[in-house]
C-alpha cells in the first residue's frame, strides 16, 4: 500500500522540468553512486543551456479594472457620519476577529498606493479595531542581503500569519512589478514572469483558506503635491518626506502605467483589487473597513 502511494504521487508530480528518479536502495554504496551520477548528469545538462521545458499555461479568472485615470476622486464623508461609521465598523471588526481566531482562519491585507495617499492612517484605523495579540502590521522596505539571495517571494512567505491571525502588509510583493520594474532592480523577463508567480502565490493562500484583501490607495497629483508641501512645512511631519518621494513623483506617469498593468493582470476572482479613493481620507478609511468586513464574512459564511 505504501509503495502504491509513492508511485501515485510520483506519477502525479513528475514533469519534464522536475522529474523523479527512482534509485534502488538495496545496496547503499551503489545507491549513492547512482544518485551522484544522476545529479551530475542533470547539472551538466542545465549548464549546456538546455531550453527550458515548456510549462503548462495557467489561467487566472481576472476581474475588469478601470484605469486609474478614470477613478472618481470626489467621494467624501462628513466628520459626524465618519465618527458614526467608524464606531460601527470597529465593533463589527472586533467581533469578526474573535470569530476568525475561533475558526482558525488567517487574513492577509495588502496596502499599496501613491506616496502620501494615506496608507498609514488607513492601516491605523483598521488596526484600532483588532486585538493586538492577533494581528501584525508589516512594513516592507528594500530587501536585505540575505533576502536578495533568495526568490523575491521568500521574505513574504516568512511573514504570513498563523491561523486565526491577521497580517497587514504596508507595501508588499507587488513591488516586483512597480518599483523593481521601473528602477531596473530586475530584468524585464523577471517582472513579466512575476504576474503569474504572484497569482499562483495568492491562489495557494486562498486554497489554504486565507482571506486575501488588496487595496490600492488612490489620489491625484495635485493632492499628492499639497500633502508633500504640508509635510515639508510641518516640523513633526518632516520625517515622512524624503528626496526619494520627490524622485518617484517625477515618474508619476510611468508608475501609473505600471500600476494599471498590475491591477489588470492580478485582480483575480479569489484575490481582487479594491481602489480606495483617498482624496478624502475619512471616506477611504471607512471603505477599507467595510471591504475587510465583507471579505471576512463571505469566508466565514461558507
Q: What annotation goes with each model-predicted range?
A:
Residues 1-302:
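Glycine-rich phosphate-binding loop of ATP-dependent small-molecule kinases
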Amino acid at each position: 500500500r505504501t509503495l502504491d502511494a509513492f508511485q501515485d504521487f510520483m506519477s502525479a508530480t513528475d514533469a519534464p522540468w522536475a522529474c523523479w528518479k527512482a534509485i534502488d536502495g538495496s545496496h547503499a554504496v551503489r545507491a549513492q553512486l547512482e544518485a551522484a551520477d544522476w545529479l551530475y548528469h542533470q547539472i551538466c545538462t542545465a549548464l549546456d543551456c538546455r531550453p527550458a521545458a515548456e510549462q503548462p499555461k495557467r489561467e487566472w479568472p481576472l476581474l475588469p479594472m478601470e484605469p486609474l485615470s478614470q477613478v472618481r476622486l470626489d467621494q467624501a464623508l462628513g466628520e459626524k457620519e465618519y465618527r458614526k461609521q467608524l464606531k460601527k465598523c470597529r465593533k463589527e471588526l472586533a467581533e469578526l476577529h474573535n470569530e476568525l481566531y475561533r475558526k482558525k482562519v488567517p487574513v492577509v491585507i495588502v496596502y499599496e498606493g501613491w506616496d502620501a495617499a494615506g496608507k498609514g492612517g488607513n492601516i491605523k484605523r483598521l488596526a484600532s479595531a483588532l486585538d493586538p495579540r492577533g494581528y501584525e502590521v508589516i512594513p516592507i522596505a528594500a530587501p536585505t542581503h540575505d533576502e536578495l539571495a533568495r526568490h523575491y517571494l521568500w521574505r513574504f512567505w516568512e511573514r504570513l500569519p498563523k491561523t486565526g491571525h491577521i497580517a497587514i502588509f504596508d507595501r508588499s510583493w507587488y513591488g516586483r512589478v512597480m518599483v523593481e520594474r521601473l528602477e531596473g532592480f530586475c530584468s524585464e523577463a523577471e517582472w513579466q514572469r512575476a504576474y503569474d508567480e504572484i497569482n499562483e502565490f495568492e491562489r495557494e493562500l486562498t486554497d489554504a483558506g486565507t482571506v486575501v484583501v488588496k487595496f490600492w490607495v488612490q489620489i491625484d497629483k495635485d493632492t499628492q503635491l499639497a500633502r508633500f508641501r504640508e509635510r515639508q512645512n510641518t516640523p513633526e511631519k518632516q520625517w515622512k518626506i524624503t528626496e526619494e518621494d520627490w524622485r518617484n513623483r517625477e515618474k508619476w506617469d510611468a508608475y501609473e502605467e505600471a500600476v494599471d498593468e498590475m491591477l489588470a493582470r492580478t485582480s483575480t476572482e479569489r484575490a481582487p483589487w479594491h481602489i480606495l479613493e483617498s482624496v478624502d481620507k475619512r471616506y477611504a478609511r471607512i471603505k477599507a473597513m467595510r471591504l475587510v468586513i465583507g471579505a471576512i464574512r463571505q469566508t466565514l459564511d461558507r
